[in-house]
UniProtKB/Swiss-Prot annotation:
Record: active site: 23 (proton acceptor), 100 (proton donor)
Principal EC category: lyase
UniProt-listed PROSITE patterns: DEHYDROQUINASE_II
Gene name in the database record: aroQ
Keywords: Amino-acid biosynthesis, Aromatic amino acid biosynthesis, Lyase
Family: Belongs to the type-II 3-dehydroquinase family.
HAMAP family, sorted: AroQ (MF_00169)
Organism: Bacillus anthracis
EC number(s) reported in the record: 4.2.1.10
Residues holding substrate: 74, 80, 87, 101-102, 111
Pfam families to which the protein is assigned, alphabetical: DHquinase_II
Catalysed reactions, as listed in the record: 3-dehydroquinate = 3-dehydroshikimate + H2O
Membrane-spanning segments: none
Signal peptide: none
Name listed for the protein in its UniProt record: 3-dehydroquinate dehydratase
Amino acid sequence: MKKVLLVNGPNLNRLGVREVNVYGKGTLATLEADMKQEAEAMGVELECFQSNHEGAIIDRIHEAEDIYEGIILNPGAFTHYSYAIRDAIASISIPVIEVHISNIHQRESFRHESVTAAVCAGQIVGFGFYGYKLALFALMEKLREA
């Protein structure tokens, strides 16, 4: 059974109460439960991790290479400025799919650039929670191609 790590970055623990007009009413717990169910149906073991701390996210990315076949990552606001997370992604050999609930290109101008996307296998934005499922499908396809 393939193993995948789902990493959610800062403030995503506030889903369901934070800017519901942008992120919707669904909670992180709901998202994680739905993703685990989807993964199980695909024969994939999914582990979920959320942190508001850059170093903790970097540590999980580093550790993932020896445990998982791939990562689905929503770096949150770190997307736009964390060269440290970018370098952590670049340092591992497993594919990473970047996902965002909202379309970062339709939001404030400071959100338009992703410093992490260039070292990811792909990026999915703007499809709400469904984007995470798309990321899982894309990651499984990427692994089949390898």
